[in-house]
Amino acid sequence: MLQPKRTKYRKVQKGRVKGLAHRGSSLAFGTFGIKALEAIWLTARQIEAARIAMTRAMKRQGQVWIRVFPDKPITKKPAEVRMGKGKGSPEYWAAVVKPGKILFEIEGVDINLAREATRLAIHKLPIKAKFVVHKDYINA
């Protein structure tokens, strides 16, 4: 699963996801992709589940790029612990995703196979997302 090798700080503030994604909102590597339509904290497990679903559907053909990285540590307090007494310990890692962000890109497969692979991957994600095609793609 994806997580940073090392970080400057062990815990980060919660923050808010506001506005649309301007950086990373267009296809840069592949011909097809998955674009997020909602804001969310995408966990490393969710990213990995979507990646596995996509690569299995493509039968190891083509190439997949993951365009989001889980670099935000999400903390959690143990069960049955009273409020207060400081922040909990880091539990898992998440990527902050804004609407319009490209999550995955695919190259080297047929458009029908890419559409099916992304459909399966989107089902693994807890948000609305859509299949996108590069503007220079010619359907041969």
Swiss-Prot record:
InterPro entries: Ribosomal_uL16, Ribosomal_uL16_bact-type, Ribosomal_uL16_CS, Ribosomal_uL16_dom, Ribosomal_uL16_sf. CDD domains: Ribosomal_L16_L10e. One of its GO terms (biological process) is translation. It holds the Pfam family Ribosomal_L16. GO terms for molecular function: rRNA binding; structural constituent of ribosome; tRNA binding. One of its GO terms (cellular component) is cytosolic large ribosomal subunit. It comes from the Bacteria. Coiled coil: none annotated. Keywords: Ribonucleoprotein, Ribosomal protein, RNA-binding, rRNA-binding, tRNA-binding. Belongs to the universal ribosomal protein uL16 family. Binds 23S rRNA and is also seen to make contacts with the A and possibly P site tRNAs. Part of the 50S ribosomal subunit. This is Large ribosomal subunit protein uL16. It comes from Amoebophilus asiaticus (strain 5a2).
